[in-house]
Amino acid sequence: EGEGKTPPTHVVILAAGQGTRMKSRFPKVLHPIAGRPMVDHVLRTARSLSPSTITLVVGHQAAEVRRALAGQPDLQFALQEPQRGTAHALQQAEGALAGRHGTLVLLSGDVPLLSSATLRRLVDAHHAASAGATVVTALVGRPYGYGRIVRVDGRIARIVEERDASPAERAIREINSGIYAFDLAPLWDALRGIASTNAQGEFYLTDLVGIYNRRGLPVETVVLETADETRGINSRSELAEVSRIVRQTKNEELMAAGVTIIDPATTYIEDGVQVGADTVIHPGVILEGQTKVGSASEIHAYTRIVDSEIGDRVTVLNFCVILGTTIAEGAAVGPFAHLRPGNAVGERAKIGNFVELKKTTLGPGSKAPHLSYLGDATIGANVNVGAGTITCNYDGQRKHPTVIEDGAFIGSDTQLIAPVTVGKGAYVGAGSSITEDVPAGALGIARGRQTNVEGWVERKKTVKT
């Protein structure tokens, strides 16, 4: 490296552990937080450093972790099998980093709250001190379960794990976060100096601090005032608590950007969701996936929206489920509407109570106000779909399309037996079962003629049984 140049950074993320306290058949690091795998949050923070390489050390259910994270070209994997501790895990990355120099930043796949600012602070402090190793520590009120930072004359001397700590060491409030920066040059040789003489019979990465001190390699610390960012996830309750923090952070970001969230504690908005200014979100709303909500819209209580695009000035009333749907400006949906994937709802269109859409286009100004199923349908502009209308799209083997052209009027309790087309401006009489195309401007009616039988009720009363 030329003088003054920052050495390259390499990130290693440990993600090999089983996570037995999760009591799960799935890899711990793949459990979702705000719609993304736990480890994906760590990866995003790692990428804020623009590292030369990112290596994920996998072990328990390694194939599943690889599959879940496939398609990320900057990510390489190293296998730890069997799992024999954190130092052993880091050693497995040596092959992937052979011939590399610079700074290695070590992260844990189950610590998703770490901020990019703290990570940058770690790297900057490490470079400024020309340290062999730099450890992120935190001051906590209840240090139980964490490795303690033992200092001599103010400098870090060693890290002692809870199981191996003396009563005096257990009283120490400064804990190890499991987040480190290392100079790569002495690292691999130092790792080979670690022994497994501890209560667990494992190779502890924390032993590196003592080894570095004995070898005269400077060890520095970056001390955090709280452990909020560095909390790990080892149980379902910890997963729930971290998820709550991530959701709270997301809600606060949206509110700071001009979104009204009436009750943030009961509002679930995933990490990938975007919401425009002056939109109002009521209690119990769930926004998932890559959903986008425009400006000045209103999403009422207990509605769930997944991977959908909601335009400006859209109203979604209570208890709707909207999946994979695009809704244009000024439209209204609900209450109790179910929009399955593949719909496009036009400007100022209306979908009312107990209406279900599937792979349907509803044109601008059209309305289906109540009690209808519209599937595999293309509906033009300014169409009225009466209550109880059903597009009968399935013949038992295949799905068929229904086309309703601009300005048509579909009377209540109508069945449209697909494939069928209702032409521009045509009317369909209420109660009809339409099996043939209705031409533009025509009236289509297909029902039995009404017959009134005079005096029938009185005669029925006189019939003796």
Residue ranges and their predicted role:
Residues 1-10, 36-124, 465:
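Conserved N-terminal catalytic core of the sugar/cofactor nucleotidyltransferase
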Residues 9-33, 49:
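Glycine-rich N-terminal loop/short-helix segment of MobA-like nucleotidyltransferase
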Residues 14-15, 57, 106-108, 136-139, ...:
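Short beta-strand segments
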Residues 29, 74-76, 155, 218-220, ...:
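Conserved beta-strand segments of alpha/beta enzyme cores
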Residues 173-276:
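Conserved alpha/beta core of the MobA/IspD/sugar-nucleotide pyrophosphorylase nucleotidyltransferase superfamily
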Residues 260-445, 450-451:
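Structural signal for interior beta-strand "rungs" in well-ordered beta-sheet cores
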